[in-house]
């Protein structure tokens, strides 16, 4: 799919999601190229419809800067009550609405916002859809002190670990940690793998977002917009 066509689909899905935001909400805003279109659509709603939000929290400085550039005030997650709605993208979405996220490296904050949200909507184009989770590296954020042992253990488990790189150096997250991308495809037993990672010393967070998403807005190449609701 050509990038211009993919961007058109992302914009359509983002505008659909923006139409569902209501004044007075505490809104969570995610990270990524699709979310950038969503933020632009929010700005238009503020200017044209008088949209006024109680608070906004974001999962990246990129989204924060874009929102502030459009006149929105951005709060810290710790300073708000439960988030009413979070709109985010997803790197892959399975038939049951489970997802892989964190391709941009912000998985820890993304998950913290998600678990503090009453409702979660993901906006994607059809290229992100899979029957079973896979087709995209699964990011695992790890502490530097234990990262080498984590890498060896993941390799022994057959999870095909790879270091996330930034040019010729290991990628460093917002929290000063490293990311190990697991290339096992498809993801073996997602719930079992999530439990394994949750109980592995040195793992800060992983990109399996299971039983979290309530709705996915999908832009298809034929121009249709599909709503999938759990």
From Swiss-Prot:
PANTHER family: RIBOSE-5-PHOSPHATE ISOMERASE
CDD domains per the UniProt record, alphabetical: RPI_A
Catalyses which reaction(s): aldehydo-D-ribose 5-phosphate = D-ribulose 5-phosphate
EC class of the enzyme, as a word: isomerase
EC number: 5.3.1.6
Residues the record lists as binding substrate: 31-34, 88-91, 101-104, 128
Pathway where this protein functions: Carbohydrate degradation; pentose phosphate pathway; D-ribose 5-phosphate from D-ribulose 5-phosphate (non-oxidative stage): step 1/1
Upper lineage: Bacteria, Bacillati, Bacillota, Bacilli, Lactobacillales
Keyword Isomerase: yes
Cellular component GO terms, alphabetical: cytosol
Protein name, as recorded: Ribose-5-phosphate isomerase A
Species name: Lactobacillus helveticus (strain DPC 4571)
Pfam families, A to Z: Rib_5-P_isom_A
Gene3D superfamilies: 3.30.70.260, 3.40.50.1360
């Amino acid at each position: 799919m050509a990038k211009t066509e993919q961007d058109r689909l992302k914009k359509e899905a983002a505008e659909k999601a923006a139409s569902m935001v209501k004044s007075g909400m505490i809104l969570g805003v995610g990270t990524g190229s699709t979310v950038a279109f969503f933020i632009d659509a929010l700005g238009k709603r503020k200017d044209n419809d008088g949209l006024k939000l109680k608070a906004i929290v974001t999962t990246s400085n990129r989204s924060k800067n874009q929102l502030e550039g459009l006149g929105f005030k951005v709060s810290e997650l710790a300073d708000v009550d439960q988030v009413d709605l979070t709109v985010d993208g997803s790197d892959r979405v399975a038939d049951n609405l489970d997802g892989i996220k964190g391709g941009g490296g912000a998985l820890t904050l993304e998950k913290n916002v998600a678990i503090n949200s009453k409702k979660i909507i993901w906006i994607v184009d059809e290229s992100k859809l899979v029957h079973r989770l896979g087709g995209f590296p699964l990011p695992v954020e790890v502490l530097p002190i234990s990262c080498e042992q984590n890498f060896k253990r993941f390799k022994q488990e057959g999870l095909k670990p790879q270091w996330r790189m930034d040019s010729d150096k290991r990628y460093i997250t917002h929290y000063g940690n490293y990311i190990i991308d697991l290339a096992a495809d498809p993801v073996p037993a997602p719930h079992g793998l999530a439990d394994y990672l949750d109980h592995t010393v040195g793992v800060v967070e992983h990109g399996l977002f299971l039983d979290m998403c309530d709705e996915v807005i999908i832009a298809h190449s034929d121009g249709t917009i599909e709503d999938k609701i759990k």
